[in-house]
Curated annotation (Swiss-Prot):
The active site is at K75. Its EC number is 1.1.1.25. This is Shikimate dehydrogenase (NADP(+)). The keyword Translocase does not apply. It comes from Sinorhizobium medicae (strain WSM419) (Ensifer medicae). Shikimate binds at S22, R23, S24, T71, N96, D111, Y227. InterPro entries: Aminoacid_DH-like_N_sf, NAD(P)-bd_dom_sf, SDH_C, Shikimate_DH, Shikimate_DH-bd_N, Shikimate_DH_fam, Shikm_DH/Glu-tRNA_Rdtase. HAMAP family: Shikimate_DH_AroE (MF_00222). PANTHER family: BIFUNCTIONAL 3-DEHYDROQUINATE DEHYDRATASE_SHIKIMATE DEHYDROGENASE, CHLOROPLASTIC, SHIKIMATE DEHYDROGENASE. Pfam families: SDH_C (PF18317), Shikimate_DH (PF01488), Shikimate_dh_N (PF08501). Pathway: Metabolic intermediate biosynthesis; chorismate biosynthesis; chorismate from D-erythrose 4-phosphate and phosphoenolpyruvate: step 4/7. The gene is aroE. Involved in the biosynthesis of the chorismate, which leads to the biosynthesis of aromatic amino acids. Catalyzes the reversible NADPH linked reduction of 3-dehydroshikimate (DHSA) to yield shikimate (SA). Keywords: Amino-acid biosynthesis, Aromatic amino acid biosynthesis, NADP, Oxidoreductase.
Length: 286
């Protein structure tokens, strides 16, 4: 039996600028079809100037949405403009998933959940580590740091060209996080069980600097939040050096699942068929 929200839960969105490149409509479209839901999920290009009005329309119901996703450059604005952000988004200062509840806009951030779910699927046992190295201190690194800290990783070393930005993250996320300059990379790699690239290095096939991963723990995992190309230069380097690697596509797929459940009432599964649909689309637009 459908609940009384049926007329509202049928239409969701992803809003960003630009947003034409988004693969979220493919992901949610796959799940809608699989469950036989008569709903929609569409991309909407919304400029920064227009975003507050877009949020107002969502709250008032004039936009016809039950909720949706927000992507660059609106994640911080979505957090600020929502009525009830949760603790995850509050610590990050950014939200990527919105839903209407009793006339209010609620908000969360599912990026970190997507990141660890990808590792859980592709590198079982990864969280038995004691130390991790995060390359980059931009917005993308926040959710990764939060998620692995909350999974119990005791030492998280953030390495960045501008160490001041890494120190800001250490101040935000507590004593488990340590800030370093790039010069410290060889030292902090020693014995670490997880290496995460959160920078744009290697995106779209661009070259990446050579990294000697040999000081990592023998069973360490190297992962990249970049998923175009699927196997980035950093992942190729790590694989050639004998380490387990996990591409970034699974993070994109898994972060989408909590929102779908909020809007449409069913928990979707990230399966190989969905993964192949997205890879096929990536190949088509390569």
């Amino acid at each position: 039996m459908r609940d009384s929200r049926e007329t509202f839960v049928n239409h969701a969105f992803v809003a960003g600028y630009p947003v034409k490149h988004s693969r979220s409509p493919l992901i949610h479209g796959y799940w809608l079809k699989r469950f036989g839901i008569q709903g929609s999920y569409r991309a909407h290009e919304v400029t920064s100037d227009a975003f507050p009005d877009f949020m107002r329309q969502i709250k008032e119901g004039t936009a016809g949405f039950c909720g949706g996703n927000v992507t660059i450059p609106h994640k911080e604005a979505a957090f600020r403009l929502s009525d009830r952000p949760d603790e995850l988004s509050a610590e990050l200062g950014a939200a990527n998933t919105l839903w209407l509840e009793n006339g209010t806009i609620r908000a969360t951030n599912t990026d970190g959940r997507g990141f660890v779910a990808n590792l859980d699927e592709r590198a079982k046992g990864w969280d038995r580590i004691s130390a991790a190295v995060i390359l980059g201190a931009g917005g993308a690194s926040r959710a990764v740091i939060q998620a692995i800290r909350d999974r119990g990783v005791k030492a998280i070393h953030v390495v960045n060209r501008t160490p001041e930005r890494a120190r800001e993250l250490a101040d935000r996320f507590g004593s488990a996080v340590h800030a370093h300059s790039m010069a410290a990379l060889p030292e902090v790699l020693s014995g670490a069980g997880l290496f995460v690239n959160t920078t744009s290095l290697g995106m779209d096939g661009e070259p990446a600097p050579a990294i000697d991963f040999s000081k990592l723990a023998r069973d360490a995992v190297v992962t990249d939040i970049v998923y175009v190309p699927l196997k980035t230069p950093l992942l190729r380097q790590a694989e050639e050096q004998g380490f387990r690697v996990v591409d970034g596509l699974g993070m994109l797929l898994h972060q989408a699942a909590p929102g779908f459940e909020k809007w449409f009432g069913l928990r979707p599964v990230v399966d190989e068929a969905l993964r192949e649909i997205i890879i096929s689309d990536m190949d088509k637009h390569a």
